Design a protein with these regions (language model features):
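Generic preference for well-ordered alpha-helical elements
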Residues: 197-204, 213, 262-273, 357-360, ...
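Catalytic activation segment of kinase domains across protein kinase-like and atypical kinase folds
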Residues: 240, 284-358
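Protein kinase-like catalytic domain
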Residues: 211, 280-283, 371, 391
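ATP-binding glycine-rich phosphate-binding loop
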Residues: 32-182, 197-201, 210-214
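Helical subdomain adjoining the active site within ATP-dependent kinase catalytic cores
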Residues: 2-59, 308, 318, 332-425
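Conserved structural core of kinase catalytic domains
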Residues: 143-197, 202, 215-272
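Protein kinase catalytic-loop region centered on the HRD/HxD motif
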Residues: 274-287
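Conserved beta-strand elements of beta-rich interaction domains across eukaryotes
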Residues: 106-109, 114-118, 224-227, 233-236, ...
């Protein structure tokens, strides 16, 4: 009996030890898996950061051009000599378009710098990119008069905008005023070359065209085709700026948790509708919004709508010229940016120039999720009706101009009636 008891005790102890061993192995496996996943996340984030965030290289290249006398501007001295314009957090989403938050003295701003896409290991591409970069700052040529430069700008804007009713004379005057960076009443060759390079950028052109409307951040200064704008205090439009690897359901939940109160969202929504109105046959031509992702928009502390990133808002004429050259086999081949779609002409195998959806339709699709949720019960039904009528619009805005304007005004009136009594509206 004692032997049986001893055997039972030994067996029990062995089983306990085996259970403890299995638990230890399981714990070690979980820890190893956590380290592996954590390392993968760190690697992905670092790889993404090192590829996307090359602001130091971009500013160093611009300062080299400044010291050679190729470029000039109100930000050059602060960036290259005094070190009072500093880059902070990387906001880039594309390697060729460096975007950083930064400080310029006491001012918070956003620094944008264009960079060649050629990989560092591709020597041939680097040489070609170098030639293109040098050529970019060769215009206008030495000896160009201010009057000739004015004509060059006007011709460039005509090609970009291509609308008879656009006030291109006023836009040309604004471009010349911006070129005189030190406000001495003269435009140096380096200043002219810098402003010419900036005018090739759609986002800079839009900021110049809408500088009095308040929808785009104010331009604070430039150096070559690097330029600084005011920082939009709250961006993205809703939610938080989550890493790309965050699950979609987490991002969507955050979008709803971190949105402002409804009457503030209504005011922001009115700002978006006013921007759509300004971009449709505005004083300086028509522009198309080719990516209405929430990350590209934001708002101020007073809940005034702002465009945080205008790189995907393009002049309609520029869009039409680019899309006409695009070969296609089906309609899905005819996409510019993210959501500027046209149809495919199968007889020519070319994309047609007319967009399938006007800006207003895409804006209403954003507002359906943004302003309809939590809307007061007394206007929710009518608001939903107007938003659905808006999203049902088809064809370009020119083809249904009256209906386009009617839907836009109905939405603005409905929102304004509800929020006009609020002191911060």
């Amino acid at each position: 009996q004692d032997n049986v008891t001893c055997a039972g005790v030994w067996l029990t102890q062995s089983l306990n030890q085996w259970s403890e061993f299995r638990a230890s192995v399981r714990c070690l496996f979980v820890c190893w898996l956590a380290v592996l996943v954590g390392s993968w996340v760190v690697y992905v984030e670092y790889s993404s950061y090192s590829e996307l965030c090359r602001g130091r290289q971009c500013t160093a290249a611009m300062c080299a051009k400044y010291r050679k006398g190729l470029v000039d501007g109100s930000a050059c001295s602060s960036l290259c000599d005094k070190d009072t314009l500093e880059l902070d957090k990387c906001l880039s989403t594309h390697a060729a378009k460096q975007v950083y938050s930064g400080m310029w003295g006491d001012l918070e701003g956003v620094v944008r710098c264009r960079m060649d896409e050629a990989p560092a290991y591709d020597v041939g591409s680097q040489m070609e990119a170098g030639k293109e970069a040098a050529a970019l700052f060769d215009t206008p040529p030495t000896g160009t008069s201010v009057e000739k430069f004015r004509e060059m700008i006007l011709d460039h804007l005509k090609a970009k905008v291509d609308e008879e009713q656009a006030n291109l004379g006023e836009l040309t005057a604004r471009a010349l005023a911006a070129a005189d960076a030190n406000k001495d009443g003269r435009i140096s060759l380096a200043e002219a070359r810098s402003s010419w390079a900036l005018l090739q950028l759609n986002d800079f052109l839009l900021a110049l065209a809408l500088q009095e409307r308040g929808h785009t951040p104010k331009i604070l200064g430039f150096c070559g085709d690097l330029y600084v704008t005011e920082k939009v205090p709250n961006a993205p439009l809703y939610g938080v700026r989550a890493p790309a690897w965050t699950p979609a359901w987490v991002r969507r939940a955050a979008d709803h948790w971190f949105t402002p109160a409804w009457h503030h969202r209504a005011k922001i929504s009115m700002g978006l509708l006013e921007l759509v109105e300004d971009l449709f046959h505005g004083a300086f031509g028509s522009f198309l919004m080719c990516d209405l992702s929430a990350a590209h928009f934001g708002y101020t502390g007073r809940y005034d709508f702002r465009v945080a990133d205008a790189q995907n808002i393009v002049p309609q004429a520029t869009f039409q010229e680019a899309i006409r050259q695009q070969r296609c086999d089906r309609d899905t081949d005819c996409v510019y940016g993210v959501d500027c779609l046209t149809s495919c002409d199968l007889t020519k195998r070319r994309c047609t120039p007319e967009v399938a959806e006007p800006n207003l339709v895409k804006a209403c699709r954003v507002l359906e999720d943004y302003v309809l949720q939590g809307a007061p019960s007394d206007i929710r039904e009518e608001l939903e009706k107007q938003l659905y009528a808006c999203m049902a619009l088809r064809g370009s805005a020119e083809q249904a101009e009256i209906q386009h304007s009617l839907v836009l005004n109905n939405l603005k009136t409905l929102l304004w009636k509800k929020i006009s009594h609020n002191k911060d509206s």
